Amino acid sequence: MHDKILILDFGSQVTQLIARRVRDGRVYSEIHPYDCDPELIRKFIQEQGGKGIILSGGPSSVTEEGSPRAPQIVFELGVPVLGICYGMQTMATQLGGAVASAESLGKAREFGYSEVRAHGHTNLLKGIQDFSTSEGHGILKVWMSHGDSVTTLPSSFKLMASTESCPIAGMADEERSFYAFQFHPEVTHTIQGTAIIERFVHEICKCKPDWVMGDYIAEAVENIRKQVGDEEVILGLSGGVDSSVAAALIHRAIGDQLTCVFVDHGLLRLNEGDMVMEMFARNLGVKVIRVDAKETFMGELAGVSDPEAKRKIIGKEFVEIFQAESGKIKNAKWLAQGTIYPDVIESAGKGKKGAHTIKSHHNVGGLPEDMHLKLLEPLRELFKDEVRELGVALGLPREMVYRHPFPGPGLGVRILGEVKAEFASLLQRADAIFIEELRNTIDEVSQKSWYDLTSQAFAVFLPVKSVGVMGDGRTYEYVVALRAVQTQDFMTAHWAHLPHELLGKVFNRIINEVRGINRVVYDISGKPPATIEWE
């Protein structure tokens, strides 16, 4: 039995990052809502290999009546507990400390980078720091996101970290191995965050690092076979990483019981339809049905500008096509999708208590209630980098596994406002030029292409026209935005600092080769506050 960590979710949009950091250390983790049955927690710890518990952040305030609390059993099972942000506040409140809102303290809410003084006398932080001051104090560069603060430590706790604006930024009860931080060690903005979480998991909880992707494959294959039995599965294939890996995993489990349906909705990347068919016929050997649905999708999207409405229309059309195709396949009872963790967390409003909805994804937010197929989502607990690792372990070619992510709604959410065939054609050509130049431009330091150095890159069509000059004439044409980001987990991201020469070449090619576009801009927004996709 593998050692495990239980994560109780209080509604944070980055709870899954905690699980990712734990898994980075080759320890299995599970996420459950904070108000799950206490018996589940007891069994997880006492019967299923659980070695520790982490309490996530969340949007609530412990100072408000009826706010979430951790089940009391968490503090009675004799295992280490780590509280993060809201998790720290509820731990302090439940164990006898005090918490106050920023307003009551006459302070502003704290959001963004901060420097925390680490008190290194605790087992958790000893020796972990980014730099030290002239007085010898260890300093951590961290990410804060809170309004409330702990003002009084519980009687058995001591101070573990502090800032000027947050005097109690960390606390510890070493005897019971209870620890808590006001900052977020799970996000990449906290430089030593991974080291802190791995210290907690490996040294405090004493978990053995023995969970590997091979174990996940074996478990997933067994689960798929149990779920599906002798029934057949239909999978919507886009050619992207997620659906490709899902197809490979399901095919390994049930072979020819899987039929992939590739829906060409006219919103794919340039020439992608032909490439998808060739790739899967050559590499996977699975049954693939190609459906030309361009006119259907364009007709349904005509006049629709709202991004949520577009996503739901696209999701609905996908499902209806799958249902029509499944009627032609004997014993087809399941619809498989490449839903992954970030899809689920960003669609938090659909079943996640306390979380704030950001956007819905076509995989999880646009499905009709009367869907006639059961849902199979074998990747829904994996992050993007884990999906890639799984793809390699399944034997998929690198060019398939490391292709940049592409949204299920395709260019439908990269064309802002109403979707038209004319706009899709312009965007396809501009995007192809951008990706081609990223692949062809090598960074002198790393000797890698800028395509490999970016996690996701694409063009966005803006439904506005700008004045330009070409030759001796005035132009009044459309604008395209370029977006390129670097990220480890797609939950947070930094904009990519592409060479100006590369951006200049992309601009020149788009302006000269794509008639109808006369202006190109580059998006330098990070996530947060922006999302990676524009819609």
UniProtKB/Swiss-Prot annotation:
- Gene Ontology cellular component list: cytosol
- Name the PROSITE patterns on file: GATASE_TYPE_1 (PS51273), GMPS_ATP_PPASE (PS51553)
- What Gene Ontology molecular-function terms does this entry list? ATP binding; GMP synthase activity
Q: Where does ATP bind?
A: 238-244
Q: Which residues form the signal peptide?
A: none
List the active site: 85 (nucleophile), 184, 186
Occurrences of domain Glutamine amidotransferase type-1 (ranges) = 4-210
Which domain of life does this protein belong to?
Answer: Bacteria
Task: Look up the EC number in the record and give it.
Answer: 6.3.5.2
Membrane spanning residue stretches: none
> So, what pathway does this thing act in?
Purine metabolism; GMP biosynthesis; GMP from XMP (L-Gln route): step 1/1
Task: Answer yes or no on keyword Ligase.
Answer: yes
EC class name = ligase
Q: Which NCBIfam families match?
A: guaA_Cterm, guaA_Nterm, PRK00074.1
What is this protein's function? Answer: Catalyzes the synthesis of GMP from XMP.
What name goes with this protein? GMP synthase [glutamine-hydrolyzing]
Q: Which gene encodes it?
A: guaA
